[in-house]
Amino acid sequence: MNLAELAEQNIQRFGEQTTIIYNDEEFTNVRLLRNANRLANGLIRLGVKPGDRVVVMLMNSPDVIVSYQGILRAGAIIIPVVFLLGEKEVSHILKNSEAVAIITSAAFLQKVKIADQGIESLKHVIIVESQDIPGTVSYPKLLAENSDERPALEIKENDLAVILYTSGMTGVPKGVMLTHKNLYSNAVSTAKTETPEPDDISLHVLPLSHSYGLTVMNAGWMFPNKAVLMPWFDLEEACKLIEKYKITGFAGVPAMFAMMIHSDIPDHYDLSSLSRCGSGSAPLSVEVMRGFEEKFHCIILEGYGLSEASPVVSTHYPDRVRKPGSIGQPIPDVEVRIVDENDRDVPLGEMGELIVRGPNVSPGYYNLPGETAKTFRDGWLYTGDMARMDEDGYLFLVERKKDLIIVGGFNIVPRDVEEVLHLHPAIIDAAVIGVPDPIMGEEIKAYVVLAEGEKVTAEDISRHCREHLATYKTPKYIEFLTALPRSPVGKIMRKELRELHAKVKE
């Protein structure tokens, strides 16, 4: 189970063929592999040793794929970083990981220079553009000046392949350690749930720096199908590419599907080739799922995962019953349990914490033994997500433990309230949080985003909620925003909403 073998296995099974289309240029699997070997040899010549950490901070491009495979072939460890992060977060990752090199773009060089201050481990800044910038190494020169033969290094399945830093929504980002076995097994198991047709072509819109995008890329090596790669998600550009290449599907996040429903941009393009999409990274509301499927006649298969599980835990299988609101069934080789506070299995249908076991589960957090001991116990990953399982083995995600709202002793699941808010025709996005209350302990506050041109009042929305919810589940406070704060892959940043509320109260 060696992640660096994926490209070679693809060539052995399917021969030389186009794997990626980027900016209308076709990249074959052989071309990507040879460039990965050149980069690996170049990194070794720079002094990168097995076990060293190398950061990759780029927008999506074939250079990211080459960089990942090249780093692994040099025996080093990939540190993917979302280019949208600020200098402080990048500095923390560079320092915590003790990275020896970073592969980035000239566009982010100023950010790297600020983040790099006082970090002694970082020896090389590699720039992907064909520019001669003092103090940097030219990525094109590394490829041009080194052999395309694979370095003779032994890589074991339990060697670290990636340290994936969490988004930091609950504090300082933690480095999730993932081995070759973790990621390879997850790619294989995920691929087993797919049934692509020979002519299927996908659109890759997810950041390759995120665990979801990383596994979609890894699983893609298991098939002979092409993928069109976008630097970053842009709705109009995505629609253009879907029409041009007759895209049959893409893996996305709920915010993307909601955007496609509420925007009129898709109306100007022929998107009839779409047949099946996948959703993950954040809960998909039933309203968004139904709205997307009705508008585009394309089904969405929702799944669930987290970085600590490499990341996929469950999905809807294409040939099985779909249950709206469910995150599907566990993927092959992955076990799940729903347990109470004493680690006892709860009865079917009852809520408890979702715990996971399998070859995909991380060995822990980098340099954080205390956090590792709390989250990984007796071979099980304690996700912190509250869920329930039905009689058919389908999982239903309820909420993060820390996001449950307790109003006068009643447990409120934010998603229940958000589903009702999404039913209102004027609302295109919504999130709720618990805010302190001296009498009830907590009260519910809703943040809503209205569709363009819509004019409704907080009382209108309260009335709508009272028609669908118990009184104690109806938001006491409603605030309008132009957009919800979301992570780069669409997760609602509830921490920022809590901070926003705290500032208003000051």
Language-model segments: which ranges?
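Structural core segment of the AMP-binding/adenylate-forming
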Residues: 25, 41, 45-46, 73-141, ...
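Conserved pre-ATP/AMP-binding loop-to-beta segment of ANL
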Residues: 16, 126-127, 146-165, 172, ...
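Conserved AMP-binding/adenylation subdomain of ANL enzymes
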Residues: 184-201, 209-248, 259, 263
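Conserved AMP-binding/adenylate-forming core of the ANL superfamily
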Residues: 8, 16-61, 65-69, 86-91, ...
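AMP-binding/adenylate-forming catalytic core of the ANL superfamily
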Residues: 41, 85, 102-104, 242, ...
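Conserved AMP-binding A3 loop
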Residues: 28-31, 161-185
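Gly/Ser/Thr-rich phosphate-binding loop
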Residues: 222, 247-252, 261-322, 335
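Conserved ATP/PPi-binding loop(s) of AMP-dependent carboxylate-activating enzymes
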Residues: 329-333, 344-375, 412
